[in-house]
């Protein structure tokens, strides 16, 4: 199941939980246009990371939860703003370091042609950067052997390293 399907399922879960039974009500609740919602439902478009962050901020959950199967979208966390792009860049940098990939060519090679070197560079620019849509994130995650939501999930220090001495 790709992240757009999961996103749509989670939006439907929200709609049911909040008794939102029309596109207009759901769109108003999420602060998006009805057209956007219909395009997502029909899979002719997918939300950007920025839009994912805006929706998550509106409903009070982590952005990654919206693209995680049965994600905790009802968590009602208190945070200033989600920033999936920043987390994506941080996670990719860490992955590149772990894999010993230092040149742009080596980094792009990890994605088996799904992401060009130029596109990858554009994601990392400080200004006038681009962010990958969900479909591209799915391809990137697939190439790295990870679920898509993990690319935009901030990993806590204790999750990065297992400090238990006995894993039994």
Outline where the language-model segments fall:
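DNA major-groove recognition helix of helix-turn-helix/homeodomain DNA-binding modules
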Residues: 50-65, 133-150
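DNA major-groove recognition helix of helix-turn-helix
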Residues: 15, 41, 51, 59, ...
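A short, Lys/Arg-rich alpha-helix, primarily the initiator
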Residues: 1-20, 73-106, 110
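The alpha-helix within a helix-turn-helix
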Residues: 27, 56, 108-110, 141
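Helix-turn-helix DNA-binding elements, focusing on the entry/boundary residues of the two helices
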Residues: 22-23, 49-52, 104-105, 137
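Central "turn" residue of the DNA-binding helix-turn-helix
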Residues: 31, 60, 102, 113-114, ...
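Short C-terminal boundary/hinge segments that cap the last helix of small helical domains
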Residues: 60-79, 145-162
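Recognition helix of helix-turn-helix/homeodomain-like DNA-binding domains
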Residues: 31-47, 113-131
């Amino acid at each position: 199941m790709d992240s757009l399907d999961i996103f749509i399922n989670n939006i439907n879960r929200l709609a049911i939980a909040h008794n939102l039974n029309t596109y207009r009500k759901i769109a108003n609740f999420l602060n998006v246009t009805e057209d956007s919602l219909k395009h997502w439902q029909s899979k002719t478009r997918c939300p950007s990371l920025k839009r994912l962050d805006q929706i998550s901020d509106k409903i009070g959950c982590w952005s990654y939860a919206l693209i995680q199967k049965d994600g905790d979208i009802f968590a009602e966390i208190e945070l200033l703003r989600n920033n999936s792009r920043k987390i994506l860049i941080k996670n990719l940098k860490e992955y590149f370091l772990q894999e010993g990939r230092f040149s742009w060519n080596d980094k792009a090679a990890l994605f088996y042609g799904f992401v060009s070197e130029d596109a990858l560079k554009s994601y990392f620019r400080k200004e006038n950067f681009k962010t990958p849509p969900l479909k591209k994130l799915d391809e990137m995650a697939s190439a790295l052997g990870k679920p898509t939501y993990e690319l935009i999930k901030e990993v806590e220090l204790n999750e990065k390293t297992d400090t238990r001495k006995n894993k039994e």
